[in-house]
Design a protein with these regions (language model features):
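Negatively charged, low-complexity tracts enriched in Asp/Glu with abundant Ser/Thr
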Residues: 1-16
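Acidic, low-complexity intrinsically disordered segments
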Residues: 55-92
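A short, structured beta-strand/loop element
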Residues: 16-58
């Protein structure tokens, strides 16, 4: 699953290629940031735009990450169909 998408405020977003599971197209996503003891993370799915596992992010931060994911979903879908990496971007 390691197609890099972006880094914003030291939070990295990676995603899988597009997968076909039970006749449905899905993309797995993972947000992560380094902390003093390892990593905070939030793992989820598109098109559901939901998180399945989280650790270390506050509820407000998770809301912001979910909003970021919703706003960027069309690009992530496109990149996931094309294999991701070469289209990735970085923002400070």
């Amino acid at each position: 699953m390691k197609n890099y998408y972006s880094t914003v405020n030291n939070v990295i977003l990676t995603h899988s290629d597009m997968l076909l599971e039970n006749h449905a197209r899905r993309v797995y996503v993972r947000f992560e940031r380094q902390n003093d003891h390892g990593f905070d993370f939030a793992e989820g799915l598109l098109p559901e735009n939901t998180f399945t596992k989280t650790y270390g992010f506050s509820e407000d931060e998770l809301f912001e990450l979910q909003d970021y994911l919703r706003c960027n979903a069309p690009l992530i879908w496109e990149f996931a169909q094309e294999g991701g990496g070469m289209f990735a971007k970085s923002a400070a």
